[in-house]
Regions:
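Gly/Pro-rich, tryptophan- and cysteine-flecked surface segments typical
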Residues: 19-336
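Sec-dependent, cleavable N-terminal signal peptides
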Residues: 1-21
Length: 336
């Protein structure tokens, strides 16, 4: 069991904010950016970058474009009722990078998340193009803070008929939806982990962001097992629809009650599992709901000391099909 003084915790935060966050992803065909915050009235903005690592500049005679060219479709998903989405296609040539300010790129979505999917530039088909990487910078002007978070990449797995740009079709059933079922694309993880958090206080605060692709009609449960410095375990439950960014104290008071000396900053961690997702219209239940997550932590007395990243993960979520399509797909079957 180890503890940090308040001064030591501040130094740890300073180092964490200065270093690049670890990247456990590899070039993929789908990128998911967990936070889009373009509330300009509150001094918030998000810078989104997408990079095409394909280097093939040989001209494709079918498209008259370099073979490594890809169309990427940005799907901005509104994180509040009615949880609608809008899409914007962009073209990336080999070794190209596109960086946009989300609020200018799509002013219709102030708060939510973003999915970027590789497509053939001539017919909009979903393609196996595992060359995309990306990240985002969430800017808090009022708090003088920025947070850099890598996009979470999902590789295309299906290798269907060759498309005009030379890439293989990723959409096996041709429904225009990216299905994270271990056949078309990689599955979502089974478990998430918050590897560490400081006890919440006047000087430390953090939040978690969760993303689910089940659509606006599902209330998604999240099950927490929280551990303190003494390895004591606390279980808590939380619910959201589609997307949420919630303070740790909005989940449970355990996050500010880890015990120990008042002169020492206590540290804990937690295991996070998607629980039951209930359709609020039909009552249908999806067990072990697939979710993604990201974290942000701040040291409040020090401007600029904010650091975040994707939650650690393990396993594969194996929830399968529903009467209206796959459990885990985008666009979701419950949205238009």
């Amino acid at each position: 069991m180890r503890k940090f003084s308040l001064v030591g915790a501040a130094l740890v935060a300073l180092v964490g904010s200065a270093m690049a966050q670890p990247n456990f992803d590899t070039p993929s065909s789908v990128l998911i950016y967990p936070i889009v915050d373009s509330r300009l009235g509150q001094g918030m903005g998000t810078v989104i970058s997408v990079t095409n690592t394909n280097r093939n500049r040989v001209i494709n005679t079918n498209t008259n474009l370099p073979t490594g060219t890809v169309q990427v479709r940005y799907w901005y998903v509104k994180g509040t009722d009615p949880w609608t989405f809008t899409d914007i296609p962009e073209l990336l040539t080999p070794n190209d990078i596109l960086t946009v300010l989300a609020g200018n790129h799509n002013p219709e979505v102030e708060l939510g998340f973003l999915i970027v999917i590789a497509e053939d530039p001539t017919n909009d088909a979903l393609i196996n193009f595992n060359y995309l990487i990306g990240d985002e910078i969430v800017i808090d002007v009022a708090g003088a803070r920025t947070t850099n978070i890598n996009a979470m990449g999902f590789k295309a797995l299906y290798e269907g008929p060759e498309q005009p740009n030379g890439a293989d079709l990723a959409d096996r059933d041709g429904d225009g939806r990216a299905e994270f079922n271990g056949d078309e694309y990689e599955r979502f993880p089974d478990l998430l982990y918050l590897s560490s958090f400081f006890e919440q206080s006047a000087t430390m605060e953090g939040d978690l962001t969760f993303v689910a692709l089940l659509g606006r009609d599902y209330r998604v449960g999240v099950n927490f097992l929280i551990y303190d410095n003494e390895e004591d375990q606390f279980s808590r439950n939380f619910f959201f629809v589609c997307w949420t960014r919630v303070a740790l104290l909005g989940i449970s008071s355990v996050f500010d009650s880890l015990g120990g000396s008042a002169n020492e900053e206590q540290v804990g961690w937690c295991r996070i599992d998607g629980g039951d997702a209930v359709n609020i219209l039909t009552g249908r239940v999806i067990f072990d709901a697939p979710i993604l997550g990201a974290k942000t932590q701040r040291v409040l007395p020090y401007a600029g000391l904010e650091f975040g990243g994707l939650l650690h993960h393990s396993g594969e979520n194996r929830e399968e099909s529903t009467p209206s399509g796959w459990v885990n797909q985008f666009p979701p079957s419950e949205l238009p």
